[in-house]
Amino acid sequence: MTPRGLLYIPIGTPIIAVESGYVEAIGWNQYGGWRIGIRSFAGKRYYYYAHLRQNYPYREQLKEGDVVTAGDVIGYMGHTGYSTKENVNNINTVHLHFGLQLIFDESQKEGNNEIWVDCYNLTRFLYKNRSTVQKVGESREWKRTLQMTDPAVVKYQKTVKKQ
């Protein structure tokens, strides 16, 4: 682990959602490669997971707007990115770029007012308290072994259904 939020772990290692929320961004980014952005339900935290695996970066059928629960498998470790062409491994070292952005008002979402947290101590804590996962048969998928109900997910889903 490094102070810049980079984790060096073998390719294909499952990536776990840190906090429950909804998928705000998913897809190719020329710098981050295959990446996922998850916004907390309160809208105050944004988690960025980048450089995911080539050809099979995400949990099956994960898409923008989906709700994820803390501990869910969301993607897989890789080294994609630094290319305008999709699905390219232009990074020499397999790693996860993990970022946490704090947002207290809309002006902090993009631009000079962004607040990004040094994730070193957070990643150490999360590693020690990580969700247990298991491989799904002969597939490329992994899933959590213990299911849980997050009250924040239930509340969010009820709010969305009312709209």
Per-segment meaning from a language model:
Residues 21-23, 65-77:
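A structural signal for short beta-strand/turn segments enriched in small hydrophobics and glycine
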Residues 2-3, 39, 50, 78, ...:
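Residue-level detector of conserved, well-ordered beta-strand and adjacent loop positions
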Residues 49, 74, 97:
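Short alpha-helical segments in extracytoplasmic peptidoglycan/chitin-binding modules
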Residues 29-31, 73-82:
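Short, charged beta-turn/beta-strand-edge "cap" motif at the junction between a beta-strand
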Residues 43, 82, 103-105:
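Short coil/turn motifs at secondary-structure junctions
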Residues 86-163:
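Acidic, glycine-rich catalytic/binding loops that coordinate metals and/or anionic ligands
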Residues 10-12, 17-61, 85-94:
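Zn2+-dependent peptidoglycan hydrolase active-site motif and core
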Residues 2-10:
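N-terminal post-signal-peptidase region of extra-cytosolic proteins
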